[in-house]
From Swiss-Prot:
GO terms for molecular function: protein folding chaperone; unfolded protein binding. InterPro entries: Heat_shock_Hsp33 (IPR000397), Heat_shock_Hsp33_C (IPR016154), Heat_shock_Hsp33_N (IPR016153). GO terms for biological process: protein refolding. Belongs to the HSP33 family. Disulfide bonds join 247-249, 280-283. Its main location: cytoplasm. The gene is hslO. It comes from Prochlorococcus marinus (strain MIT 9515). It comes from the Bacteria. Keywords: Chaperone, Cytoplasm, Disulfide bond, Redox-active center, Zinc. This is 33 kDa chaperonin. CDD domains: Hsp33.
Length: 300
């Protein structure tokens, strides 16, 4: 089954619920970037977080950029996600592997805190008009879910709960995804709604296990927490949306990037190499700029 976003509301429209599946997008990123299982999990979590944020944007060409700058061995990450469900991204150290750590439930987990270290989560929301909205918060623990919840609390003052996880079995990524539950802005001061959100979300003991057991049925995950969702609040067409890894790079963008070099640099490339190869950081696609194309830039 393909990746997707599912939307719903509860409490007569007072609580917004969004669930996202990013399994295939994460697998594609793993293949393109040569990611380890640790970095696959981290980037998959960042994919889920970015898409959850982008899902609330009003216009389809709206975009969210999620960047982590930190002192950990991961060396940061960058994700670009659209309201249209398209996502791409990369990490600074794709091959990173660390020892697993034991959790409170005596299970073993990736050491996200050590991988990311201390630093900052930066979120940019771009609606495609006016100045993009930018906000930065300190990392909480590097597991992305709590970091995103901190961003929503400090930057948007919205009571929210964020769950993000994945399941890896027999060296295969089985599933990756997330869930966002938040009191809508007009209801954020309603103590009963805030209490309801807190009580329902306490029922989630392990989102990764819930995601795995759901067999990609995101609506069932939502209904496990809020069985009384508002069925008619969102049209069927708007409720579900496709998600996929897709990059916006192109040969023309590569040519435009080359044109920003001065003529001396272009002549040096032409003399030494006779061509140029540009590699997209987001997807690793390669674009060859040949002798004639570079020569044309110099003459322009």
């Amino acid at each position: 089954m393909g990746d997707k976003i599912v939307r719903a509301t509860a409490a007569n429209g007072g609580i917004r619920l969004v669930a996202v599946l990013t399994t295939n997008a994460t697998r594609e990123a793993k293949k393109r970037h040569g990611l380890s299982y640790l970095t696959s999990s981290i980037l998959g979590r960042a994919f889920s977080a970015s898409l959850l944020l982008a899902s609330s944007m009003k216009i389809m060409h709206g975009r969210v950029t999620l960047r982590v700058r930190s002192d950990g061995p991961l060396k940061g990450l960058l994700v670009d996600a659209g309201r249209d469900g398209k996502v791409r991204g990369y990490v600074g150290n794709p091959n990173l592997e660390l020892d697993l750590v034991k959790t409170k439930s005596n299970k073993y987990s990736f050491d996200f805190t050590k991988a990311l270290g201390t630093g900052y989560l930066n979120i940019i929301r771009d609606n495609g008009f006016g100045e993009p909205f930018t906000s930065t918060v300190e990392l909480v623990n590097g597991n992305i879910a709590e970091d995103l919840a901190s961003y929503l609390y400090h930057s948007e003052q919205t009571p929210s709960a964020v769950f993000i996880g994945e399941k890896i079995q027999n060296k295969n990524l089985i599933c990756s995804g997330g869930l966002l539950a938040q009191v809508l802005p007009k209801k954020e001061t309603d103590p009963l709604l805030v209490s309801l959100l807190e009580d329902r979300c306490k029922e989630i003991n392990s989102f990764s296990e819930d995601l795995f057991e759901s067999k990609d049925d995101l609506l069932s995950i939502i209904k496990n927490i809020f069985p009384d969702i508002d069925d008619k609040s969102i049209s069927e067409n708007a409720r579900t949306q496709e998600v996929r890894f897709e990059c916006r790079c192109s040969k023309q963008r590569s040519l435009n990037a080359m044109k920003m070099l001065d003529k001396d640099e272009l002549e040096d490339i032409l003399k030494k190499e006779g061509k140029a190869e540009l590699v997209c950081e987001f997807c690793k696609n390669k674009y060859l700029i040949n002798f004639e194309e570079i020569e044309e830039m110099i003459k322009a």
